[in-house]
Every structure is written in C-alpha cells, then in structure tokens.
C-alpha cells in the first residue's frame, strides 16, 4: 500500500548517470504542516465523523443490567411472541403478566402479587400500566395517580444507588390485642395487604371510646440473600374533613403516626396538632407517603377504631450507583392510562425515560406488540458506548452534531460542528523535511497513535498549554522538533487525556446526581461546561494532528533512510552517494543488469525490512526536485504501515 519513487538524472559525462530518490508532487497535492515534519497529500479526511444517537434504550454492559416488567416482558404470556423485544432481552427481566411493582407493594385484592427482586448495575423498568385508571382500584381512594408518582419516583431514586433490590413481602410485627383484621366495602369486602387494616370496637354510648393503638414492625437488615441498607415504606393514614366526620361520638381526634426507635416521628398524620384538610364528605380518603427508612424497629400509634399497619417494603442494598431507565408504560386503545411513570422518571436525577411519540398500537392484541416500542427497545440487545436521554451511541467518535441531553452514562460524545474537526492527510503521502534526515539514522519510531486518538472522551486545556507538548529543543539544521521531543509530546498527551477523562467522568456522575429535567439553570451550566470541553478536545486534536503529521513524516523519512542505506550497500564501489539519496553510476562499468540488481533488487526482493506490495521499478526524470530534498510517496490506508519500493525509472543524458 506504500510506494517509493526513484528518479534518475542525466549528467554531462556521457558514461555516468545520477540516480536520486525523489518526490513526485503536482498541483493535486496539498501541504500539511506538522511538528517535526510536513506532508504532501492527495486527499484529506476529518479525524472523526459526527455520530447521531439512536432513539430508545440500550445498556453499557450486557452482563450488568436487569429489568423489571410485566406481561410485555413475560415470555410465558401468550402474546409475548409478537411482543416488544427479543427472547434474549426478555430473559433479563423479572416479570409476571398482570404484575407491577406498586401492585406488589400494596397488594390490592384480586390483583397479581409478584415477588420482584434482582441485582444489576443498570436497571430497566418497563412496568406500571397494571396499576392505572383502567384497573379501577378504589380502597378509600378514587385516584391513586399521585401516590403512584411518588412511589415510582422513590423506586427509581433508590434503584439508582443500589446494586440489588427486593420486595420484602412479610415484615415482622406486633399488634395490640384489642384489634382485629378489618375489611372495607369499597375494597371488594377485603383490604390491601399493605398497609393492613386493623379495627377496634368502640362503644361511646357506654363511655368507652377505646384505647390508643400501639403496634411495632421491624425492617430487616437482610431478606433472604438480599442485603437491606434502606427500605421504602408506605406510611398510610386516613384524611377526614373534620373531627365530626372521623368520630361523631366525640371520642377524640384522629392520628396515625410512625416513630423510630428513639421516639422521633418519621411519618403519618396527627389531627391533634394538625388541622383537618379532607374534602371527601362523610367518607375519608387514604393517603400514603413514601418513607426511606433504615433497618430497625419502629412503632405505630393510632387513635382508637382504626390502625393502618405497614407490612411490606422494598429493600435496597445502596452499594452501587448506576443508570436507571424507565420505559413509558401505557395501554393501547380502549383503556385509560396515566403518565405517572413518565413524570416520576423526568423528576428523578439519573433516570432516562423511553417515551413513545405515537399511541400504543398492538399487533398481538391491542396492548402487546407495538412496533414503535419494539424499535425503541431494540437497543437492549446491544452494548452502547454511551446512553443518554437523547438516545444511545455505539460509535467511537467523540463528537455528535447535537448536545446529548442528560442524564447520560458511559463514553459520551460532545457536541461539535463538522467544520471544526481537524483534518489529517490521506491518500498518497509525501514527506518533506530538512536535508539531514537520510544521513543520520533515527534513534526510534513513534507508535501508539491509533490507541491515543480512538475513543477520546473529554479533555480540557492543561496548565502547560501547547508548549507543554513540545519538550526538547529543535534541531539546529532546521528539520523541526526532535524525534525524542515528539515522543514525549505523545506521551504527555496520552497521560493528560487519561487523567482528564477520569476526572471528567467523575464530574459528570456528580452532575447526574444533581440534574433533574426541570432544573433549567443546572442544565444551562452543564451545557456550558460541555461546550468548553468540546472546544478543548478540538484544540487537543489539533495538537495531535500536527504531531501525527510530523510523526508520519519522520517515519517515512526513516524508511527512506533504510532504503537509501540498502541501495548503498548493494552498490558497493559501483555507485557513489554524492548527496543524501543520490548516487552517480558509471554506465560503462555498471550496465543495465547491474543497475537492476542495485536499484530494482532484480525485481525479486524489496528492502528486507519493508513488506512488499508492488516491486515493479521504473525510472523517470523530474528536474524540479533536483537536490538533497528527500521524500517518499505513499498511500495512507494505514498511516504507520511499512514502505514498499515501486516506480523507479532511469533517464540517461549523454
């Protein structure tokens, strides 16, 4: 893939000819300047192309993610074969048809109760639709959407800080003797599994208003094999319009309060000190607040008549931060949905929402097998280099045309304009340099360019500036910076980029913890920071480009030196090197076959250190490049590949 050209120049003495290694440059070449050497090239290309994120969900590592779902990810469901994802992806989900995390938390009568649990750095949630307005769950509340919103938000928040999570479906408890398990007409003559309803008989006509309820529950440090550092607990209580609505018999105010082991109030409602704020008439409503509690023993105190007892929780190990993806979970036509999942994710730092642009149109049935959702989830079959609210990227380029919206994780590209990305020479390359490069053998080569520039993420301007990359002194002959200087420059850039990449990723993770989608000021600040990083990276790439050009030029000159040395060795006394890369041969002493041996290697073998591609040799004259200026024309499919002799010609002048 590389070619060299030899030029023969005629001398005035008829029996002698002058043959030189020579550049062949015309107006189609462009000049590229570098640190330590320059290049002529027939083509040029950008160091990186802009990439465009793909819409939908993906993961950074196939072995470290887990999903939580329902019938749309349940392979045992009859509608699954025409559902939304591959069987391979569905295997990663903990799912049961008809289930949802909230259904398992509260356990309304007649609904699916599934033990959700699992571990993974990245958690994908595609569930929630089974608790929606279509489910028509009442139990002292006509609309559970705001509770669902707070529940899902708490789940996403804690999941983003944990490696493992699990439903704890049976808390240890102690209840007072005077209460019994209760039911409610508007709960199908039953009640929720969590909280459980306990009732106490009250006889005010006999001046017996009942006793205050005192109960205890324990949040475990471990549930099965799952460690519990923090629990999500639903603190539920009734809301009454007034004291008279709660207790028309004059037996005191309503209260339902949770205390920790030190006696501190952690949740509940106390109408002994707080006003009544209900608006439901004679029927109370039930409110459930989401509490994040550490393992331990807690007490519940309530007024007579009713006790709402926490009997379930979700436990989290809080061991590892990681991405959370929430997939919009809505019904197809004919069923009413809510958008609690969407709102919960958008208001939770670190949560990426996968959202449809069109109504859900199922293919297996009205509610399973939507084509748009299938496309949005197809990325779960692959590993991405970057995942973000804008989509996922698996290309190696560090630049994208548009700013990727946070949150984002992985090796994410920065926004840049195409015209700002530096260009490098390509196609046929010819080095130019000072006149001393073929008489002084270079000490060493420079390697590692591809490793250095492929996969760059974020870099910033370092304190040393550009000058910090040009260590060492210039050669007195004017041939550019020394090779040792260039090597140190590459090493410094590599080290700086690795350090800055690490520190920048840490900074981005901290920003993910702070950013929510409605915090415009933080979003604007993040955008400014990323724009600065993009400009810094482009500046670094400009330096790398200049060093790269110089490195290629030096490398080609070294190969040229090897070629010249081999020719001189083969010629022995038959050719006299009169200047770097030029020899005089007596045509009467060294005939055509002799010249073929010296310059064409008998058309059988190239220079031993240079792998062959084309060993044909032709000689041609180009008097414009007479003298000691040296070069080697190459094709640059691989910038650091070895050279091959090709295209040497002899021109005689008597």
Curated annotation (Swiss-Prot):
Keyword Hydrolase included in the entry's annotation: yes
Signal peptide (UniProt feature, chain positions): 1-14
Region (N-acetyl-9-O-acetylneuraminic acid binding), start-end ranges: 157-309
Active site (catalytic residues): 71, 365, 368
Gene Ontology CC terms: host cell plasma membrane; membrane; viral envelope; virion membrane
EC numbers for this chain: 3.1.1.53
UniProt entry keywords in alphabetical sequence: Disulfide bond, Fusion of virus membrane with host endosomal membrane, Fusion of virus membrane with host membrane, Glycoprotein, Hemagglutinin, Host cell membrane, Host membrane, Host-virus interaction, Hydrolase, Membrane, Signal, Transmembrane, Transmembrane helix, Viral attachment to host cell, Viral envelope protein, Viral penetration into host cytoplasm, Virion, Virus endocytosis by host, Virus entry into host cell
Extracellular side: 15-629
Annotated segments matching region Fusion domain-2: 364-654
GO biological process, one term: fusion of virus membrane with host endosome membrane
Fusion domain-1: region residues: 15-40
Positions of transmembrane segments: 630-650
Reactions catalysed, as given in the entry: N-acetyl-9-O-acetylneuraminate + H2O = N-acetylneuraminate + acetate + H(+); N-acetyl-4-O-acetylneuraminate + H2O = N-acetylneuraminate + acetate + H(+)
Highest rank taxon of the organism: Viruses
Pfam families given in the database record: Hema_esterase, Hema_HEFG, Hema_stalk
GO terms assigned for molecular function: host cell surface receptor binding; sialate 4-O-acetylesterase activity; sialate 9-O-acetylesterase activity
Chain intervals for the UniProt region annotation (Esterase domain-2): 309-363
Cytoplasmic side: 651-654
Glycosylated residues, chain numbering: 26, 61, 143, 188, 394, 551, 602
Summary of the function given for this chain in its UniProt record: Binds to the N-acetyl-9-O-acetylneuraminic acid residues on the cell surface, bringing about the attachment of the virus particle to the cell. Plays a major role in the determination of host range restriction and virulence. Class I viral fusion protein. Responsible for penetration of the virus into the cell cytoplasm by mediating the fusion of the membrane of the endocytosed virus particle with the endosomal membrane. Low pH in endosomes induce an irreversible conformational change in HEF2, releasing the fusion hydrophobic peptide. Several trimers are required to form a competent fusion pore.
Family in the record: Belongs to the influenza viruses hemagglutinin family.
Name of this chain's protein: Hemagglutinin-esterase-fusion glycoprotein
Organism, scientific name: Influenza C virus (strain C/California/1978)
